[in-house]
UniProtKB/Swiss-Prot annotation:
Its EC number is 3.4.25.-. It is an enzyme of class 3 (hydrolase). PANTHER family: L-ASPARAGINASE (PTHR10188), THREONINE ASPARTASE 1 (PTHR10188:SF8). This is Threonine aspartase 1. The gene is TASP1. Protease responsible for KMT2A/MLL1 processing and activation. It also activates KMT2D/MLL2. Through substrate activation, it controls the expression of HOXA genes, and the expression of key cell cycle regulators including CCNA1, CCNB1, CCNE1 and CDKN2A. It comes from Homo sapiens. The active site is at T234 (nucleophile).
Amino acid sequence: MTMEKGMSSGEGLPSRSSQVSAGKITAKELETKQSYKEKRGGFVLVHAGAGYHSESKAKEYKHVCKRACQKAIEKLQAGALATDAVTAALVELEDSPFTNAGMGSNLNLLGEIECDASIMDGKSLNFGAVGALSGIKNPVSVANRLLCEGQKGKLSAGRIPPCFLVGEGAYRWAVDHGIPSCPPNIMTTRFSLAAFKRNKRKLELAERVDTDFMQLKKRRQSSEKENDSGTLDTVGAVVVDHEGNVAAAVSSGGLALKHPGRVGQAALYGCGCWAENTGAHNPYSTAVSTSGCGEHLVRTILARECSHALQAEDAHQALLETMQNKFISSPFLASEDGVLGGVIVLRSCRCSAEPDSSQNKQTLLVEFLWSHTTESMCVGYMSAQDGKAKTHISRLPPGAVAGQSVAIEGGVCRLESPVN
């Protein structure tokens, strides 16, 4: 087992306003001061997938992660809910043609796009998800709307509101609730169509020569590198707002050439994402979003496993042990040659301000980590105090074998927190 602990630190203390000299304050200065005070804090960590990210497309992956972070922080600064902020980040990731989510998603065996997405609110513990959804540009928006509608209580005649919808039913529900549809030709990009044609030809050739399943599997894995297109790049984000509320979301187009109707981890409870505020039995608020081979993540319920593990004192060690013992060495995946997946996690807790600080304020201590068994994982992160987002493509160390090795990195930051 190979482990990497290159701490890409995001330590950033809240900036302090400079002292104002005595004298008159203009109306413009007063307005500026008021708008500054009205801005809320928070932190976001996003990923553009665990899979294979070529050097040639590194710039595009990092750029979309930066934009996603900025969208989430803008929401948090405006006082939006953590769920709305994490949704804003995911919408930006879904709209990129370089990610396997929303627009440009992998095509299934019939050449169609079917998307999965889910979101969880750490404060209410409510959850919303869609699976095998076609015709909607941003599946995470439907998942978030399901979550919001579910919080309103029972429907007419005492009916229980749905939290998870699939296929045509999910599409009709979205349209009925004002979410616009999107024609298939808009959702499909030239990149996804070209990849579909290449993969389809290889599949047809394999079937003609009666290639067995294992040979076909190896062909598919190698084609990811040859075509410069990772098929496991589910996208996701985790957020904590200035009050310490957390949220997590995930979105995916699924595996290339998947069977129509297949639903992956991105739509399933405890598998794609998890968020849970601090409580009587939880000293930390935690948020998790996963990526990788959906079937592997489903059978290990990895998102929830990681969240529970993060209640330990040492977050880094807890996540490493979870990836090793609950994922790579999981008895539920004993028949797999390589276990492919990745996670981004954050945990937060309230604590006193820095010891050398003269201000009697509480802060939110936010620890954030990412870990993967795939060859690479692209992440971005940003706090409300940062001028811009930081991005990074994490890779397994030289000589490490994907599916059998673990890379883990992360950092820490402090956010001002209102005292309750």
